[in-house]
Amino acid sequence: RVGALDFAPSIASGKCAASEEMVVAVADGEISRTDTGVIMLDLDSDGDDRTGWVILYLHVGSTNKARQGNLVVSGTPIGYPSCEGGSSTGTHIHIARKYNGEWIAADGAIPFILEGWTPHNGSVPYKGTLTRMGYTITASDVASFISLITAGQ
């Protein structure tokens, strides 16, 4: 998806290895739809992906995955990162958002700010940055301590 963000857990081995780190809801809402590797979080909880803000999580594993109709609050565990659902080169979560049915770019007029981290497109796909409080990290396609961030910190 154009404008999506990818986050990979710290895993010891294997491109599609299981992760013990959970994916959490970025906001309060209702799980409006699930499919193989997919969770849709409807922030206005009306169950309609065409209205209001909706968050897409892609590559969510089937183990302990939130179910359609679940109401969640920000920070609620909703599943585990995986390679399920679509094409994937390794265990990660792909997160994007829609407003009234239209995909909204992460680095656009309304940036996709997560816990103060603001995304910026790179010169090529998958080489963007996140900036918070004057600190910038650059996306990495290999496990790198310098690109490590943790929700809630």
Regions found by a protein language model. Give the residues of each.
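Short glycine/threonine/proline-enriched tight-turn/helix- or strand-capping micro-motif at secondary-structure
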Residues: 1-26
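Zn2+-dependent peptidoglycan hydrolase active-site motif and core
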Residues: 18-68, 89-97
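Short beta-turn/strand-loop junction motif enriched in small, turn-promoting residues
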Residues: 12, 28-30, 44, 80-84
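Acidic, glycine-rich catalytic/binding loops that coordinate metals and/or anionic ligands
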Residues: 13, 17, 67-73, 96-153
